[in-house]
Amino acid sequence: HVCGLGSRDTLRIEAGYPLYGNELNTSLTPIQAGLGFFVGAELKQTLKEQFPNNLPKVVYFKVLEKAPPPRNGYEIFEGESSIGKVTSGCLSPLTGEGIGFALVNSKISLNESEKYSIFIRNRKYSLMFMKRGIIYS
């Protein structure tokens, strides 16, 4: 059972809500943080012109195997190449799966389970990137 900040983190991660200092900060644009829908069309176009498409972006994931909880700083891989790190993660009480946010530096594919993995406690586990929030899936 979780309580205090642990319950806050679990609930926000399950819902797909980012946290300032983890998934949101002054060095990421709203588009990188996955919040482009809050930005007006004119500013969105300006941001896209100013920043290349290969900038890191915040994405939501779930671990596809029984695994320890994903934690901040754990590496995400595409094949053998590191493509990013976890910014927030937990085990979901709803599904029993590891879920979280990661900052990745490459284009990723949603709902593909063959390509991606996470390194947790010296072992790789398969993961899948998905739309935010397991309660909305």
Predicted features, each with a name:
Residues 1-137:
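Conserved, structured C-terminal
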